[in-house]
């Protein structure tokens, strides 16, 4: 008989944590641990001091949350939080461990024990995808990333930039980026535009809090207070980090009905799981 691990269901509310109990094969949890240990984005963070577990996906304020955990654990302030903090690869520096760094039994405890506090953040999929485009495809990432430059060049090739009167060096338009994501998403889940249900695995991780990017200061403040962080420190841990210089546009200026439908179908599970409306692109300000 297969070993079973009891977990709870994730909720869309930022005060989640009391969902129905479900049973999950321990082998599936171990499969998740094996995947996490090879995750190049190092999305999971385990704070032993505060006994909390965080999974951070790109464009959901993950730099701010990771930096906060990094500092709360007593690690040195980094000269350049992005991208050093995410890669955990700076020589001579120490970092908060990832789940894959732990022995399997310890990691199972982090995922299943009521003694551990688990949280994550989500974002409206329309807004998150456009934010990823602005940060990595529309212009050079900061610092420049050869990886995302190659993706931009791949899109230009797929869409035949340089032909039919299109300049080869033209900025990749958002619609072409969306088409690229749709074509590659089944095989290539990038940390910054992956399906959130794929990256957060709510089927395996019982999150006590699922915070929202749209109410980040309030939700992360609640997380920090629950962890017992001193009240005078909290405002410094809520300051924006790694914000782009491009002014926010209403999503209705970016999407039309067809493009919104295309993105909705790509991220349908994210919309339903985390409580975002299909037509939310029309009401964004």
Which ranges hold each PLM region?
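Membrane-interface amphipathic segments in extracytoplasmic regions
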Residues: 1-285
